[in-house]
Amino acid sequence: AVDPDEKMLQLNKFENKIIGDAEDLPFPDNSFNSVYCAFVWRNLNNPELGLQEVHRVLKPGGKFILLDMTRPKNNFLRMLHKIGTFKITLLIGLLTFNLKEYRFLHKSLDKYPQPEVHLSNDLFNTIDTIRMGLFGFVYLTVMEK
């Protein structure tokens, strides 16, 4: 597991934990058969640099599996989702005394484009993108180097 926050690494159950950044991965070229990233991509300062780094550390034919959230594609569902996540994140933030963190989650969904747009690049072949969850706002994309 790689995370820039040591506290987050302490929470996970992976055996190998490294403090690091997805935009500057601390691994040699062609190191991994697969890279898995969950609910992080929309928070990167430079997602394009992150894609370049994942490509660099993957072996030829390696898979990049990305799980994250975005707004639904449909305009009406996107509006409902935006209203719903605003209210839910506000409530959870108030109840847990973490309003700043939960407001950030709501706002991060607005700045993140649809995966089909954001992840289209010359580095990877996209194998599939599957939308899940209510309104399809959670997605899983599998790409190959």
Annotate each language-model stretch with its function:
Residues 12-17, 60, 122-127:
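Short glycine/proline-enriched coil/turn segments at helix->beta-strand junctions
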